[in-house]
């Protein structure tokens, strides 16, 4: 019975949070340590924000924001890594940091002020940044091991910097 009540109240709380979070001041945080990790959140309209911190082991995280002020931050330390950031409209801004092991980071931004930063240190790297319309700006830094970077920018301010160094 206790398990049922706990599960029911958890579902109710998540449902309520989803309704208010979809069109309010938004904000989301996921902090994880060790083992099989995976962090996911989706936000819809208004003030958005973000943050996903993952420490060690199999990692993987996905964050999706849709409209208004956006902002996102993802950090992954150690092991199999992989981070996806999708932002669609308005002030955008995304930062992804990865350290150690298989890495891979993808940032997709669509319209407005854009800005993307990806830093990868150690092991098999690979970074993709897609920006489409408005002020754009992209920086990718990769140090040590696999490297690879791809940046696609389409209309408006554009600017892309890729720095790669080995050891």
Task: Locate each region found by the language model.
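Positively charged n-region of N-terminal signal peptides that target proteins for export
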Residues: 1-8
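Bacterial N-terminal signal peptides
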Residues: 8-17
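Sec/Tat signal peptide C-region and signal peptidase I cleavage site
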Residues: 18-24
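Low-complexity repeat regions of mature extracellularly deployed or surface/particle-associated proteins
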Residues: 24-167
């Amino acid at each position: 019975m206790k398990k049922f009540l706990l599960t029911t109240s958890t579902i109710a709380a998540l449902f309520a949070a989803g309704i208010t979070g979809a069109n309010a001041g938004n904000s989301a945080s996921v902090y994880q340590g060790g083992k099989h990790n995976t962090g996911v959140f989706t936000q819809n309209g208004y003030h958005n924000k973000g943050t996903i911190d993952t420490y060690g082991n199999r990692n993987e995280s996905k964050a999706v924001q849709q409209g208004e002020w956006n902002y996102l931050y993802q950090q992954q330390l150690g092991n199999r890594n992989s981070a996806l950031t999708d932002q669609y409209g308005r002030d955008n801004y995304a930062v992804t940091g990865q350290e150690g092991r298989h890495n891979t980071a993808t940032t997709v931004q669509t319209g407005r002020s854009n800005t993307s930063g990806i830093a990868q240190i150690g092991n098999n790297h690979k970074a993709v940044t897609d920006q489409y319309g408005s002020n754009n700006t992209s920086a990718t830094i990769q140090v040590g091991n696999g490297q690879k970077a791809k940046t696609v920018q389409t209309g408006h301010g554009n600017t892309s910097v890729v720095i790669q160094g080995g050891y």
